[in-house]
Amino acid sequence: MKYGLSILLACTALVPAPALAQAAPTADDIAALRAQIQALQSQLNQLQAAQQAQAAEVAKVASAPVPVPPKAEAPGWWGGTTISGKAFLNVSNIEQRSTDLAGNKTDNIQYGTQAELKRFYIGIDHKFNDVFSANVTTDFRYNANGTSKDVLVYVKKAYVQAKLNKAFAVRVGAADLPWVPFAEGVYGYRFVEPTLIDRTKFGTSTDWGVHAFGTFGNGLVNYAVSAINGAGYKTLSRSSNTIDLEGRVSVNPVKSITLAVGGYSGKLGKSNDTVNVHNRATRFNALAAYTDKRIRAGVEYFSAKNWNNITTAAVPLPPLDTPNDKSHGWSGFGSFAFTPKVAVFGRYDWVKPTQTVAVGTDGPVKDHYFNIGVDYKPLPPLDFALVYKRERARNGFINTANGNIGGLDNGTYDEIGLFGQVVF
């Protein structure tokens, strides 16, 4: 009724004053006006009812429980499994010659141009939970140094790992050794050449045994230690009755600086009850490097005792090796990235593999090696490098990753080509 009076007054106000003076509203006019007011009141009531119904529906929807999505089905055993791979390949020309004491020169079988797939790794990692995991990595080697036409396949890694925390993890089986894989990570160009002791056969990358490692102080200090068979990952047999030890401690006082020392002691898997073993091989390693996004520079050093002299007789006869034979060498390496895709790099190695002087020579064997190159990285998993390598050994031979280099007078090894790496 309140609304009706308001409308009536409004309508009355709209009527011109002279009209009111001339004629009073009739009963029919009043009845019509009341009918209009009732119609408006009915429409207003309907509008209010519709608004209330809408509000009730919204409240009903808001108060309804949110449906719980169905729980995803847990993946099978393959859910924690990843597969990775890495390949080292090259197309290059090699010129290798040996010169004897009479001055005669002989070309090596590697002489010429060829393509090689030097390494092809396939790795399978499986994570059981946050503590336990396992890894198997195969190592394929094709046409090694041009001397073998078959495919050599090895189990490079096969281990079970328990990682209790950042400070302590342990692996049982064939796994990375403390020094060579660490040095490869600092060097950065393993696909071009192995690092110092791996190139000259004074160390290897993996072996069978028990391996512990960890880090302290938010990466300030890292350590690794291995108790191993000593014969390397290519040999798995109970042919030795001793355990070899290898260890490393590295420090990063700042993010870009790495300082490390390491060591090895053992009989390299050659000790058993049927072999006379007179010596124990030992090795000391050191490394210092600076690395950032553009610059990589470092130096690596090693010294070894009786590394190639485990089974030599106490009083040597004709063999060159003698008791307490000593070896040492160093490597300097560096690279500079002009852009994230283009970098130049280089390296120089000097090695004295033995202190023994062969008859007719003027001193012990000495090996000089260097490489220089330009690396192009179109994508993070790909590297293509144009490389030149040069090696010269005097007064004898040295067994290296590129073959047996040298001559009784001297020997040279030159290689130029395209070297690549594919990682997935």
What spans do the regions from the language model cover?
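Alpha-helix capping and helix-loop boundary segments enriched in small/acidic/polar residues
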Residues: 236-237, 408
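N-terminal periplasmic/intermembrane-space "pro-region" immediately following the signal or transit peptide
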Residues: 6-11, 20-102, 424
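Outer-membrane beta-barrel pore domains
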Residues: 95-98, 107-109, 146-148, 158-163, ...
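N-terminal signal peptide c-region/cleavage motif recognized by signal peptidases
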Residues: 16-18
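Active-site-proximal beta-alpha loop/turn segments in soluble metabolic enzymes
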Residues: 226-236, 266-273
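A general secondary-structure boundary signal
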Residues: 29-36, 40, 47, 79-81, ...
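Outer membrane beta-barrel
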Residues: 70-101, 109-231, 239-261, 333-338, ...
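Positively charged n-region of N-terminal signal peptides that target proteins for export
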Residues: 1-4
